[in-house]
Amino acid sequence: MELIFNIEPQQQERPRATGRGRFIRVYDPPKTAKFKRELKQLAMLEMRGKTKYEKAISVTIRFYRKVQKSISKKEHTRRTEGHVRPIVKPDLDNYIKSTLDALNGVIWTDDATIVELNTSKWYADDPRIEIEVKELKNDEERNQN
């Protein structure tokens, strides 16, 4: 299954905590919480009428972030054509965390079903997240086919 979400990738920011008496509440910062809500809603629309993955899956995620406006046209072209990749923050692992959290329970029943994960960061004029999910056959099923 291939999915394209037209949403700007958002890093998982450090959780915030508030305390009231002996109770402490930990929560996502507003930007991260908004991103997770919006991505989850987009995924729910895509998954309408489809069954969630329950078995072992392989997931490939490509994060496309905006090209900075302060660069030359030549550099802009190099970035959008994939000759130059983003080596700046946010880190790839923070993109992964926020995205997998948002999609957990929507595309797959639990993120424990993800046994292979391939991710990458790219530049693009239209920020988005592209996801490919493949259900993997176990060794017993492979040997029978």
Please give the residue ranges for each predicted region:
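Acidic, proline/glycine-enriched N-terminal capping motif
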Residues: 1-145
